[in-house]
Amino acid sequence: TGMVVIAGTGFFALAGGAPAIEIQTAGVAPPFSINLRFGLYESLFVFAVNLAGLLAAVHYLPRLREHAATMLLFIIMLMGIDGMIMTRDLFNLFIFIEITSLATYSLIGFEGRETQLAAGFKYIIATSVATTFFLLGTAFIYYQTGTLNIDDIMARQALIGGPVGQIALILLLASLLIELKPYPANGWGLDVYEAAPGAIASMISVGVSAGVLFALYKVLPLFGDFLTSIAVVGGITFLVSNLIGLKQKNVKRLLGYSSIGQIGLLVLTLALLHKYDQPAHLALIVGGLVINHLLAKAGLFWLAGVVKLDNIGEWSGIAGKSLTLLIFGICLVALTGLPPFPGFWAKWALILELAVDELYGWIALVLVGSLLEAAYLFRWFGHALRRGDTTPVTVPGMDLMPPAIAAVVLAVAGYFSAMHAGVVPMQLFLPVYAAFVLYLLDGLPGRFKSLLMIASVAAGGASVIGELQGVNRIFGIIMAGGGLLVAIATFYRSDTRKGFYPLLAALLLSLVILPGVRTSLEFFFSWEIMTLSSYLLITLGRDAVRPALVYLLFSLGSAFFILAGFAIGYASTGSVELASLGGAGDAVPLIFTLLGLGFVIKAGGFGFHIWLPGAYTEADDDFTAILSAVVSKASIFGLVMVAAYLGVQADIGLDPAYVLGWIGMLTATFGALMAVFQEDLKRLLAYSSMGQLGYIIAGVALMSHLGWVAALYLTVNHFLYKGILFLAAAGIIYRTGTHLMYRMGGLIRNMPLTFVAVMMAIIAMSGVPPLSGFGGKWLLFNAMMDKGWYWLAAIAFFSSAVAFLYMFRILQTVFLGQRKLEHRDLREAPAILLVPQVVMLGMIMLLSAYPRLLLDPLSAAVAPYVPGTLHWDGWALVSHLGYWNAPLIMIIVGAVWAVPLVFLLLMSLSMKIQPVKQFNIVYAAERPDRPEDTHYAYRFFAHYERAIGFLVKPRATAFWSAVGEWSHTLAASMRVIYTGNGQTYAFLILAFFVALYFANGGTV
């Protein structure tokens, strides 16, 4: 505790502007004394390492109390790490490395288990070889410079040269890199992480590695000619370690792969920042990554020690334990570089600096490695969320204190990192604050929490929307007002739904903030909060853990494309302002492609849509309505933003827009075709949502005034009819207990209001007059014909016809036909589910009769980006292809339907009507034994399979499954070197040194 207090006091004093402290021993100046420096960076590392050491000691306290020698060794290890960080003498650095290695070796095997003794033996072999290299290199450097003081060596660096100087530097570099466990010379480290006690493994991961990393930082100026090699070693280690992590199921070994990968990323970062002279960003980037890794990784090691389950598949034992899951989730989220933790701000700054130096290959490596790490970490988290047959784990509350403190410090560090990055935290952190407050109230009744959630979102929306204008205001209203309207439906469930309302508040507030952001950093922060909260909300659904993981991985892939696009925009303009993207010059096509691809993936565009049906189907029914009606609009807003800032101002030409248009129409077509053959009601609606978003994407791609008006008009309509359909589905499933349409039928008698809402939404969605969907399709077809996109217009027409087929199926199989016996007594959907449907239905009817109420504001909103106007003749919208008079169409269609209806009603007064009974059906063979056998809904469109079935074979699913399989196969081949044999590991260490030597110009 004293070490932490002293280090912390010194750090805050230095951060406040105090001068660095120079410590000299023996009463003389260096190089004749041991010289220690306690500057700002040293104090940060010492404070962080000692804090981790204190928490690790608390975690390991029973063993430390049992054996005084263990406590002594633990303190010696900590002091050795502190010495590595503070010393300014090369030989004393060697001494401190040796002290740390010996103490660590003793702690690894102190419990006397066979696996620990074997791991300790491998550890001492590896570190002995490394320190031997270090000592030899130190001797050669002393021979050439005549000093061991690091500062003096830097001043005399010109004296280091020739074969002796080269071998000296390579020996020194190889020693430090081996201590940091580079691939492939790191098998010994993985065995240590797996076998060592959790507290000791955590300190090796975050403490010893931090000390060696700081030692590398101190002597890095000596390696100016080797910086590329250092970056390559770090990059390969980061990428390969995370790739192999995909195959890992042992918890501590998995954490070992992650630790090695994170240190590899830090090595890469140090080398590249030094090579391209970016010292100003060391504090945010390197400091953020170190603190993030130190706290998150240590917290996970300690949590693993508390849970005491070796296989990730057994972690379902903590399902339902909210505090344990919260700590687990915070550490995982931080480790993967998601907001609001320090790793997010550090990776953001790192990617931007790499883009400034046009290091696009390194950007790809960092982002791919980060995606791989997220895959295996969140797979582990998914096991913890899945309630299985595993015996529940009892986790004493006090044992959670060390990882809980780590989680709290991570959150605080994230706040200060945001301030250091120049962000105004209050507005951006609003979703986090709201989620935290609601989490503290999570024990309250569910409906009361729903009320608090709605109030918080309403307050946040009111504070943001008033400042918005134009297109941003339209999306702000959809996301805030629409989100609140659909969220009213959450009242239909009376259970507590722990975790649901805090996450929903975070999601909706992040969506509310999104249209009001001004910089790419603010946009990306809100985007990632939206991604994370929506993922966690999906996991709360039935059997949703696996679909949620697929959703998260595609969402992160989408986010990384967006991040890369923003980074290149910053590199081209020198600004993070979104409005400056149009001035990116020759980089505009690349930025457009990256951002557009990111938003298309998030929208479930063709080829990237495989996450969509599973996520929509397995999420809670009321949340699926929010996911489709509201969350999907974020990607549309992103596309509009890209088109506004790049597609018009930068005049990128037709080609990128035309490609985007084809993507949109392929999405619409294949979404419709795949919906045709679905038996699951929610899955059908999921594919339908995908298809309808395709029309909107195509509208944005048109880059014309009429096209954008059509896209935004369809966006509003998509919110309305998808909100109705998914909420209606929630009510149907709530009453029937099934998703499968062939297990329904005849529900018009039980749920007439739901039937009316669904029927009207289907008419609107299908583009059939007189409702608003017809106007949207009319606008889109006109815009396509104006643009000369005749083939795309034809495909749009075909897709609309297919959409009517599958939507007709919902009416026919769910509401019409014969009713199941068990459904005779079903009631109408809960009233609170019907309220938002009625409101949205009223809006559809209003827009169908008076579309100008919406079209004029839309036209005015897009005019600054795509100049033009809509031509009205009274209430008729006129184009050179014709006109659309919505009120007249409503009157005509109403009359067409009203006249036959009145006639039939009059005829019924004089006719004897006999309702068709369930078994009043002619069969060619035997009479069916059960009512279920009379239902024709199963495989309703089977007769179309022979004609178009080949189009909907799951080729995209097969492709992405193959990508996953190839990744696992490659990972398996990369880890064959980890045999567990100490001699093999020693050989790989020597081979690594030889490779490093020859790669940097060494000769025999």
Question: Which residues fall in each region the model found?
Answer:
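Transmembrane helix-loop-helix hairpins at membrane boundaries of multipass inner-membrane proteins
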Residues: 1-74, 151-155, 419-504, 575, ...
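Alpha-helical transmembrane segments and their helix-start/interface "positive-inside/aromatic belt" motifs
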Residues: 1-2, 118-128, 321-324, 398-404, ...
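Hydrophobic transmembrane alpha-helices and their helix-loop junctions in integral membrane proteins
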Residues: 55-64, 68-71, 79-91, 105-348, ...
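Alpha-helical transmembrane segments and their membrane-interface junctions
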Residues: 332-350, 408-422, 762-779, 841-862, ...
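Aromatic-capped, Gly/Pro-kinked transmembrane alpha-helices
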Residues: 397, 420-424, 854-893, 901-1004
